[in-house]
Amino acid sequence: MHETRIVVGPAPFSVGEEYSWLAARDEDGAVVTFTGKVRNHNLGDSVKALTLEHYPGMTEKALAEIVAKARSRWPLGRVTVIHRVGELWPGDEIVFVGVTSAHRSSAFDAGQFIMDYLKTRAPFWKREATPEGDRWVEARDSDQQLAKRW
């Protein structure tokens, strides 16, 4: 049985609880997770806060499509994608991606694929608060290059 959890919202999440849910399937020998956090700097400037916005409904649909594409490429068990929105502070967790599979190679590849596609294809917008004022975060070419490998 394949299970997917996709959550987009302002609430914090527990990495431990998410891992426990993923690891509960005895059929899977591999659990791979990634947790992204707000950094206190970007582009050489101090970052005081990060505001994430999304397009409700469209964002969840895009994430579901990314997970479906990963499932079509690798034999996966459970998949979790959580992305926070709203105002966050340095050190806060932003995103969690977790995947399970019978073997590590599929789990690692699928986790990277989901994260690379999330960064380039899911409709999220970031605004940083810096000492010099607020600014929108532009898409990075390096993220596009990583997504192209798939």
From Swiss-Prot:
Alphabetically sorted, this entry's keywords are:
Molybdenum cofactor biosynthesis, Transferase
Q: What is its EC number?
A: 2.8.1.12
Any single Gene Ontology cellular-component annotation = cytosol
Q: Which domain of life is it from?
A: Bacteria
Cross-referenced InterPro entries, in alphabetical order? MoaE_sf, Mopterin_biosynth_MoaE
Which pathway, per its entry? Cofactor biosynthesis; molybdopterin biosynthesis
Q: Which CDD domains match?
A: MoaE
Q: Does the keyword Protein transport apply?
A: no
- Catalyzed reactions: 2 [molybdopterin-synthase sulfur-carrier protein]-C-terminal-Gly-aminoethanethioate + cyclic pyranopterin phosphate + H2O = molybdopterin + 2 [molybdopterin-synthase sulfur-carrier protein]-C-terminal Gly-Gly + 2 H(+)
What does the function comment of this entry state? Converts molybdopterin precursor Z into molybdopterin. This requires the incorporation of two sulfur atoms into precursor Z to generate a dithiolene group. The sulfur is provided by MoaD.
The UniProt family comment states: Belongs to the MoaE family.
What NCBIfam families does the entry give?
A: PRK10678.1 (NF007959)
Name of the featured protein: Molybdopterin synthase catalytic subunit
What organism is listed for this UniProt entry?
Salmonella typhimurium (strain LT2 / SGSC1412 / ATCC 700720)
